């Protein structure tokens, strides 16, 4: 549970309590205090988001500290204030470049301040609490600095989630490194590949992706309808094709059983249309061992089973009881050629923890909440992401009450519920799609 974080917080407090008595220089002491403050704040943010006010413990407790051990929790105001103060100290005192590659540095701290302050600022605004603007303005400040430090974004969205190394990928601020050789592995893609199919995208998620003209599926002339998945996925934000497995059908007749891996394209052009689109439009290969590419879904952790077709419904399995879905949509975000049949879930692709795209969207949302979002902000944030995804740029002047007929208009049955501002709705859509 989130309460287990206090064991980690105690370890951080042990380190912080002994830094001043060390033989380090004052600058080194300040740096390592900053690292400790970052990690303690990271855990306290999880506690704050789960519980609101919680006990604030900033030193190692003894058995005699009964007032703290048995005392009431601190208020949300106090916890949020401590988190921000610690992170602001860290921002000013941590080594600019950290302690080497992929370590906690100033940009990482600023990215975390951006994330925390947007959360806390909007929570306070929509729950009628004080100081919302303080946190939103701080989000605006640090986000702008991070964006200046990371002016480029990765040109290929898929590379962010399907790369063996994120070290040199533009816009990645901090990532979790994995390696089979070091026995540090993960199984991110496995949830959508087993017979259980633990999680699947929903229709609501698919509907939220814009058409390539920048309009919603509800009012774009490019939308071809949803009676056929090939039509549904046509002329859409390319990130949809990389999040949800696009439709295809292959010829598996050369495979003698469900586990066979022999396949070829059918003679029907439609069956391979999205395979070809991925290759031509996105520079992503499909089905052979090359850099930067997706791979056909297969039963990972076993000896094979290339999936013959998508959509693949759990009530129409075609003798292949895995990678199924009740909705017809499957996760594909982390599928790549670095996965292998029989791998027993030994995945070693790196995972981004902080990247500039999130910070850009934090900035956009904070600016909107502060009433400062305009076309120049859209061009600096949302539209940089859309250009990578083959979506027309956001034109702020065109976003009105009718832009998305499915926008949340609130429910009068619930006191205090409200209609979401159309512009804010579109910024939140971009966050949902990008992240």
Q: Model-flagged regions — what are they?
A:
Residues 1, 88-89, 106-110, 115-304:
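An aromatic- and glycine-enriched ligand-binding surface/loop that stacks and positions planar moieties
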Residues 1-51, 67-81, 85-101, 227-229, ...:
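Conserved, well-structured interaction surfaces
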Residues 5-8, 82-84, 162-227, 232, ...:
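Long, intrinsically disordered, low-complexity segments
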Residues 48-55, 98, 116-128, 369-372:
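Short coil/turn linking the two alpha-helices of tandem helical-hairpin repeats
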Residues 238, 242-385:
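C-terminal substrate/ligand-recognition segments
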């Amino acid at each position: 549970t989130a309460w287990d974080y206090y064991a980690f917080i105690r370890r951080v407090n042990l380190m912080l309590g002994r830094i001043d008595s060390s033989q380090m220089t004052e600058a080194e002491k300040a740096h390592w205090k900053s690292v400790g403050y970052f990690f303690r704040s990271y855990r306290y943010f999880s506690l704050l988001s789960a519980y609101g006010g919680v006990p604030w413990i900033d030193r190692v407790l003894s058995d005699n500290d009964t007032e703290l051990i048995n005392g009431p929790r601190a208020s949300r105001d106090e916890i949020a204030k401590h988190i921000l103060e610690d992170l602001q100290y860290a921002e000013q005192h941590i080594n600019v470049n950290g302690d080497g590659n992929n370590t906690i540095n100033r940009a990482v701290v600023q990215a975390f301040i951006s994330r925390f302050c947007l959360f806390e600022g909007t929570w306070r605004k929509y729950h009628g609490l004080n100081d919302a603007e303080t946190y939103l303005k701080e989000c605006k400040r640090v986000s702008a600095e991070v964006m200046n430090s990371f002016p480029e974004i990765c040109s290929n969205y898929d590379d962010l989630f399907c790369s063996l190394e994120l070290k040199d990928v533009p816009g990645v601020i901090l990532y979790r490194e994995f390696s089979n050789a070091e026995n540090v592995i993960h199984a991110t893609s496995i949830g959508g590949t087993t017979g259980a199919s633990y999680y699947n995208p929903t229709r609501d998620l698919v509907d939220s992706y814009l058409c390539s003209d920048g309009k919603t599926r509800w009012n774009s002339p490019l939308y071809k309808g949803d009676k056929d998945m090939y039509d549904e996925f046509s002329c859409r934000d390319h990130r949809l094709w990389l999040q949800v497995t696009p439709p295809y059908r292959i010829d598996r007749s050369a495979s003698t059983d469900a586990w066979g891996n022999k396949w070829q394209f059918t003679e029907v052009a439609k069956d391979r249309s999205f395979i070809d689109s991925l290759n031509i439009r996105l520079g992503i290969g499909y089905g052979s061992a090359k850099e930067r590419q997706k791979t056909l879904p297969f039963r990972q952790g076993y000896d094979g089973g290339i999936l013959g077709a998508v959509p693949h419904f759990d009530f129409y399995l075609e003798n292949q009881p895995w990678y199924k879905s009740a909705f017809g949509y499957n996760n594909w975000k982390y599928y790549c050629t670095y996965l292998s049949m029989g791998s027993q879930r030994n995945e070693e692709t790196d995972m981004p923890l902080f990247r500039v795209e999130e910070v850009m969207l934090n900035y956009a949302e904070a600016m909107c909440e502060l009433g400062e979002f305009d076309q120049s902000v859209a061009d600096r944030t949302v539209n940089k992401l859309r250009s990578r995804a083959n979506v027309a740029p956001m034109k702020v002047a065109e976003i009105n009450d009718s832009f998305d007929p499915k926008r949340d208009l609130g429910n009068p049955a619930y006191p205090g519920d409200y209609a979401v501002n159309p512009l804010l709705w579109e910024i939140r859509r971009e966050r949902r799609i990008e992240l």
